[in-house]
Structures are given as structure tokens and as C-alpha cells.
């Protein structure tokens, strides 16, 4: 598993179910990017003098900005590495 640095958090992306309109599948490039995921790993380091505790913990389901982070694939699994500020809320 990847170990995030700084204020970064690793998310497992929740893929939405197949969308159909009138029985027709919508093309992948026409779908909205996912905005929900589960926290997989949290950085143990801090940025600058910020020693504040993280606002999320491993296992939390979160919503994030759809244009946030860097998507990576590790062992066939897709993950998103985001800054803590890109997480909009905990579900």
C-alpha cells in the first residue's frame, strides 16, 4: 500500500452504478467523475507547523472535489491521492 506524505490522504474510489437512459448505456466519457470514496491511508506527517489532527480517519466514507487529486493504480486497484482540503465532508 502507498504511504501518503504531507497533508495527503489516499482514497478508494466508489464507482457509480452503470447509468442507463431509456435502456441505453451512457458512454464512459459522458459520465460524471465519481465524488465519493473511502479513506484507505492518511499521512502521519504534517506540513509546516500544523500539528492539527486529521479531520478524517481510515474507513470513513467521504465526498471530495471531482477535480481533486491524482489517480493512481496499484496492484490493479484505482486510488485517488488528495490533499485534506479537497475533502468536502464525511458521510
Swiss-Prot record:
Highest taxon of the lineage: Bacteria
CDD domains on file: cpn10 (cd00320)
One MF term in the entry's GO annotations: ATP binding
Compartments reported by the entry: Cytoplasm
Positions in coiled-coil regions: none
GO CC list: cytoplasm
Alphabetical GO biological process terms: chaperone cofactor-dependent protein refolding
Keywords, ordered alphabetically: Chaperone, Cytoplasm
NCBIfam families: PRK00364.2-2 (NF001531)
Subunit-structure text: Heptamer of 7 subunits arranged in a ring. Interacts with the chaperonin GroEL.
Biological role: Together with the chaperonin GroEL, plays an essential role in assisting protein folding. The GroEL-GroES system forms a nano-cage that allows encapsulation of the non-native substrate proteins and provides a physical environment optimized to promote and accelerate protein folding. GroES binds to the apical surface of the GroEL ring, thereby capping the opening of the GroEL channel.
PANTHER family to which the protein is assigned, alphabetical: 10 KDA HEAT SHOCK PROTEIN, CO-CHAPERONIN GROES
Protein family: Belongs to the GroES chaperonin family.
Annotated protein name in UniProt: Co-chaperonin GroES
Organism from which the protein derives: Oenococcus oeni (strain ATCC BAA-331 / PSU-1)
Gene: groES
Amino acid at each position: 500500500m502507498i504511504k501518503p506524505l504531507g497533508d495527503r490522504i489516499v482514497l478508494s474510489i466508489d464507482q457509480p452504478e452503470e447509468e442507463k437512459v431509456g435502456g441505453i448505456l451512457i458512454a464512459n466519457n459522458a459520465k460524471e467523475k465519481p465524488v465519493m470514496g473511502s479513506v484507505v491511508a492518511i499521512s502521519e506527517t504534517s506540513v509546516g507547523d500544523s500539528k492539527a489532527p486529521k479531520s478524517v480517519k481510515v474507513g470513513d466514507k467521504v465526498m471530495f472535489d471531482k477535480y481533486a487529486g491524482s489517480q493512481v493504480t496499484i496492484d490493479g486497484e484505482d486510488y485517488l491521492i488528495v490533499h485534506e482540503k479537497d475533502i468536502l465532508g464525511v458521510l
